[in-house]
Amino acid sequence: MRLIRMLLLPVLAVTTLSAHADPKDVARLTQLLEKSQTLTARFSQLTLDGSGTQLQETAGEMSLQRPGLFYWHTDAPQEQLMVSDGQKVSLWDPDLEQVTIKKLDQRLTQTPALLLSGDVSKISESFDITSKEAGGVMDFTLKPKTRDTLFDSLRLSFRNGMINDMQLIDSVGQRTNILFTGVKANEAIPASKFKFDIPKGADVIQE
């Protein structure tokens, strides 16, 4: 559960750091993100500890739509479903038959999935951004301007102008790598995709 929470759920951030972002990097990243109003893809997710030892590997499908809508389904045997309707987030764990519901934190540093589905017009207020390009791949490294976030740095990689993968590194060096395949942008997604109906008999936790 930690992996999906790291990507999609918030933590408290209280201390501001001094940082900066190159205006050209900010403009280019913002343009790449904003041109996709919807995204659908398969994903594979790999988590390694600080020494490079594999901790967990999962796969699934995701759908995103601006502003703030997302559907993130992890396949069995570690099945989970996270759905945001833009106001609240529902996390369904079928093994526990439990739904956790909480308000969506709109801050990009607290809910990294919003980088792909939220308002990124003021992204430089949240991150120090640098970029590099090689072999047709554009990498952007984002470092939060606050302490006590879930991650110390986040990398977004684009191939041919489309999101290809992302990596999150936490304070102890643990890396979560997410590779997207079959990416489709700006195709209509049914509104029902972003609505979660609580299964009958499920335990409900409101946070």
UniProtKB/Swiss-Prot annotation:
UniProt keyword Ion transport present: no
Alphabetical UniProt keywords: Chaperone, Periplasm, Protein transport, Signal, Transport
SUPFAM superfamilies: Prokaryotic lipoproteins and lipoprotein localization factors (SSF89392)
UniProt GO cellular component terms: outer membrane-bounded periplasmic space
A Gene Ontology BP annotation from the UniProt entry: lipoprotein localization to outer membrane
Primary subcellular site in the record, as a coarse category: periplasm
Range of residues in the leader sequence: 1-21
Subcellular location: Periplasm
PANTHER family, A to Z: OUTER-MEMBRANE LIPOPROTEIN CARRIER PROTEIN (PTHR35869:SF1)
Subunit: Monomer.
Function of the protein: Participates in the translocation of lipoproteins from the inner membrane to the outer membrane. Only forms a complex with a lipoprotein if the residue after the N-terminal Cys is not an aspartate (The Asp acts as a targeting signal to indicate that the lipoprotein should stay in the inner membrane).
Similarity section: Belongs to the LolA family.
Protein name (Swiss-Prot/TrEMBL): Outer-membrane lipoprotein carrier protein
Organism of origin: Pseudomonas fluorescens (strain ATCC BAA-477 / NRRL B-23932 / Pf-5)
Lineage: Bacteria, Pseudomonadati, Pseudomonadota, Gammaproteobacteria, Pseudomonadales
